[in-house]
Amino acid sequence: QRMCPKILMKCKQDSDCLLDCVCLKEGFCG
């Protein structure tokens, strides 16, 4: 199971996101 805090963060790439979150195509981490 991925560790991804439920925080709405804008991103351009996966490395902009916290822990195991990835950058979704909507432009937010998830």
Curated annotation (Swiss-Prot):
Subcellular location field: Secreted
GO cellular component assignments: extracellular region
Molecular function as annotated in GO: serine-type endopeptidase inhibitor activity
Swiss-Prot/TrEMBL keywords: Disulfide bond, Knottin, Protease inhibitor, Secreted, Serine protease inhibitor
Disulfide topology: 4-21, 11-23, 17-29
Family recorded in the similarity comment: Belongs to the protease inhibitor I7 (squash-type serine protease inhibitor) family.
Domain free text: The presence of a 'disulfide through disulfide knot' structurally defines this protein as a knottin.
The protein's name: Trypsin inhibitor 3
Native organism taxonomy: Eukaryota, Viridiplantae, Streptophyta, Embryophyta, Tracheophyta
